[in-house]
């Protein structure tokens, strides 16, 4: 089973500074995330609100996701990247029609 995680939040800094911080941290943690089961990581930005952030990750392991996301380093990362707590939701695939 795959788990899709959505993260919606307000960036604490302007986009350029937030991107640098995000890319530095995710670059440094990519191997650990992949080892824990993170298959994909994608960020979307709102063209009408430069502080809006929407991320989608796909995980192969719920246990790996929970361990990685609950680590002090990732909690610190979220605290520095976002104003307040972002909305984080875990979703599972359905057998509904797709295209």
Model-derived segments and their meaning:
Residues 1-70, 84-99:
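Short S/T/G/P-rich N-terminal loop/turn motif that feeds into the first structured element of a domain
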């Amino acid at each position: 089973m795959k788990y899709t995680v959505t993260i919606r939040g307000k960036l604490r800094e302007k986009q350029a500074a937030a991107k640098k911080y995000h890319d530095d941290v995710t670059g440094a943690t990519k191997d650990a995330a992949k080892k824990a089961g993170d298959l994909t990581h994608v960020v979307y930005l709102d063209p009408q609100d430069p502080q809006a952030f929407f991320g989608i990750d796909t995980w192969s392991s719920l246990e790996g996701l929970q361990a990685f996301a609950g680590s002090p380093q990732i909690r610190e990362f979220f605290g520095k990247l976002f104003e307040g707590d972002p909305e984080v939701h875990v979703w599972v695939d359905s057998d509904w029609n797709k295209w």
